[in-house]
């Protein structure tokens, strides 16, 4: 199964992430965001970061998850290439782990920096057992 794909969006980047579960789709969404910034296959898993978020709804939970990851890039130049997510829909909470390392210009390709997550065109759906997350990131 394809984990994610990109779609054209004026001045920003659109992402469609897929998963066999909601958790896997959230993991794919995070991977796609970092793939915009670098080749995630070159990221080693030297650092583990734990993230806990509470959302008002599923869209807000996705927004908070991606924004939290971007804060680590903005503050510590951390790039992530692997994720593990657990979601409690009853309490609308997310517990996640992100694995990666600090950006190294000699090792990591510098692509487009993602500035922020947005709610623009955000849609979370399920089709034939596949969860689909569609959203736009600001670059």
Swiss-Prot record:
What InterPro entries does the record point to?
Answer: Archease, Archease_arc, Archease_dom, Archease_dom_sf
What is a biological process (GO) this protein takes part in?
tRNA splicing, via endonucleolytic cleavage and ligation
Is tRNA processing there in the keyword field?
A: yes
A GO molecular function assigned to this protein is: calcium ion binding
Q: Which Pfam families match?
A: Archease
Q: Name the keywords, alphabetized.
A: Calcium, Metal-binding, tRNA processing
The protein's matches in SUPFAM superfamilies, at most eight in alphabetical order, are given as: MTH1598-like
Q: Where does Ca(2+) bind?
A: 12, 138-139
Task: Explain the purpose of this protein.
Answer: Activates the tRNA-splicing ligase complex by facilitating the enzymatic turnover of catalytic subunit RtcB. Acts by promoting the guanylylation of RtcB, a key intermediate step in tRNA ligation. Can also alter the NTP specificity of RtcB such that ATP, dGTP or ITP is used efficiently.
| Family in the record | Belongs to the archease family.
Cross-referenced PANTHER family: ARCHEASE, PROTEIN ARCHEASE
NCBIfam families assigned: PRK00407.1 (NF001617)
Protein name (database record): Protein archease
Which organism is the protein's source?
A: Sulfolobus acidocaldarius (strain ATCC 33909 / DSM 639 / JCM 8929 / NBRC 15157 / NCIMB 11770)
């Amino acid at each position: 199964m394809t984990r994610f794909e990109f779609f054209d969006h004026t001045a920003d980047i659109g992402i469609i992430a897929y998963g066999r579960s909601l958790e896997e789709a959230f993991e794919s969404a995070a991977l796609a965001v970092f793939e915009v910034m670098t080749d995630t296959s070159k990221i080693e898993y030297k650092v583990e970061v734990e993230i806990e978020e509470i959302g008002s709804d599923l869209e807000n939970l996705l927004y908070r998850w991606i924004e939290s990851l971007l804060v680590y890039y903005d503050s510590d130049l951390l790039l992530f290439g692997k994720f593990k997510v657990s979601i409690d829909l009853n309490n609308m909470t997310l517990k996640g782990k992100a694995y990666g390392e600090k950006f190294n210009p000699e090792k990591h390709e510098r692509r487009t920096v993602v500035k922020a997550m947005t709610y623009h065109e955000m849609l979370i759906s399920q089709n034939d057992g596949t969860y689909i997350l569609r959203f736009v990131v600001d670059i």
